[in-house]
Amino acid sequence: MLLGFVGLGAVVETAYLPAIRNLFPDTPRCLGFDIHPEKQPEGVTRCASLGELLSHPLDTLFITTSSLYHLEVLEQALASPASRIVVEKPIVATLPQIEKLKALLAQPGAADRVLALDHWMARLDSVKQSLVAHVSDIVKIEGFLQEPSGYNAEGEPIALNFATGEPDARTLRHPDGVILDIGTHVLAMLRETVRYMDGSDDITLEVVTAKDRLGREIAMGDLTTAEGEAHLQGSISGVPVDIWLNKYAGPAGGQKGLRFYLRDGRIVSHDRRGAEDVLELIKGKEIQRWHIPGTIYEHCLAEHILGAKSLFERDPHQVSRTTRRRVEEVTLLLTLQQQLRGPH
């Protein structure tokens, strides 16, 4: 197996490569290219150019650059022989890019080659355990991504790397706030779960609150400051939804997943705790609990991307449909940004 990576930043080093090593006793050969020559993670053979990387007979190409450059790389990848192209979330970063993306995917033979990835779309254990029979059994859904954070010398909250827990040295700017950057995770998990419960893709959302890293409201016309936390509200398949996003939720963080409130009074909770997912069926003081070990990237790569059971193998038509859903979600979140900040 020959894998290629365009963009060799932290997500490759701390998420993809460890997951690949854990999944395969004989680690696949990995090639990569990055415009920054200092980025050379162990286990990846660097190519001198993107063209050189694309000239190899890659089994799967991963586009893992910053989101603003996904479209540019994807256009070149589609012009290459690469038959399986996986684009990290969000697949694009602006509304004008959405229109260009749709034109690219409309080219003959393109859509079935491109999978828009959000690794949270593999978190379907509430469906696998058959804890909710049908979306009509649900009266309310809550989605959460409340990330642990640290503090700088001034006592201000700072972001932490999601995989290592080390301080994130990046200065986050719009559009890399929580609405687009991590809201994609919650929407992907939410929509895939509801879809398997025979729900529809219909979704509406609005911004209730959005604040920066220091807790100040995002002002209309501010096209620079990233949101540090946000509360989104709406519905999916007719069910009321509240989504809570926070990149600065304190040293312990908070819930990372979904809670389904059922008509019979029970609650289904799907959370990420340490190195495992935890699924709970709550009925008063009685709690049934399931533990799902392994990183989310391991589950996603094993179940959707690589190997004989990948989505490309078991259901090729779902590749383009999955990408369409991820594009719809990004479009919705980018539209919320327009409403929050003004046209831009």
Each model region followed by its residue ranges:
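NAD(P)-dinucleotide binding in Rossmann-like oxidoreductases
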Residues: M220-E229, Q233-H304
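Rossmann-like dinucleotide-binding domain that binds NAD(P)(H)
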Residues: T164-P240, N246-A252, T331
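A short helix->loop->beta-strand "cap" motif at the edges of active sites that frequently abuts
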Residues: T27, S80-R84, A110-R113
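Short beta->alpha connector loops
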Residues: G9-V11, S66-Y69, I91, M121-R123, ...
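C-terminal helix-rich "cap/oligomerization" subdomain common to oxidoreductases
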Residues: T60-I63, T209-K211, A302-H344
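N-terminal Rossmann-like dinucleotide-binding module
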Residues: M1-G43
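A contiguous active-site-proximal alpha/beta segment in oxidoreductase catalytic domains
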Residues: T60, I91-A159
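Beta-loop-alpha module in the N-terminal Rossmann-like domain of NAD(P)-dependent dehydrogenases
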Residues: E42-V86, P90-L104, S130
